[in-house]
Amino acid sequence: MKHPLKALVPLLAVAVLTAACNPFTPRNTPTAAPTQYPQDPRFAEFVYKSDETPTVKDRTDSINIRWPNAKASEAHVVVEYSPALAFIPAQDPEFWLTAVATIPDETIQLLAEGEATDTLLPGIYPHLYEYVPQECKFTTIDPEFADKALAPDKEKIPHDFDPMDIQALAVSKDCHLLVFTALGHS
């Protein structure tokens, strides 16, 4: 009876060590499975990745300099570089931005013309969800229209704020909020 127990102990030890070293187990990193983030059914999936842990910053300049017609009075922004693709040399580094900004009536009226079919809110960095009240009603705006309306002359953007293209945008008239994602290359 002692022999089966002696054989079982080493097998259990191997099983425990193997499970601890499983490379397919999600880790708490920015590139891990999206289940690590808060969930909110109002938003599209957050698809951007970074080698760094994204940080939410309060920066109106990041919005108002790149998109001068936004005229944001408050902005919660995440800007990060996408993971580098080592096999593609001489590629300009890609970076992404997700934001929630407070905007005036003037900006809302400017964007109203670009109303598109309503869909989910843009897939912003999930730690920005807290800045989007549940009671806000949103209208989806065509990204190309929004880009041209908010930044009519991208050549005038200072070089230390690389221009970006809006990927998805929604505006709330009742809450004076702009929720959007953008991509750029530096």
Model-derived segments and their meaning:
Residues R27-N28, D142:
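Secreted/processed peptides and extracellular or luminal domains of membrane proteins
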Residues M1-V9:
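Bacterial N-terminal signal peptides that target proteins for export
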Residues L121-S186:
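Extracytoplasmic electrostatic interaction patches
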Residues N22-T25:
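Bacterial signal peptide processing site
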Residues P68-F145:
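Mature extracytoplasmic domains of secretory-pathway proteins
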Residues L17-A20:
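C-terminal motif of bacterial Sec signal peptides marking the signal peptidase cleavage site
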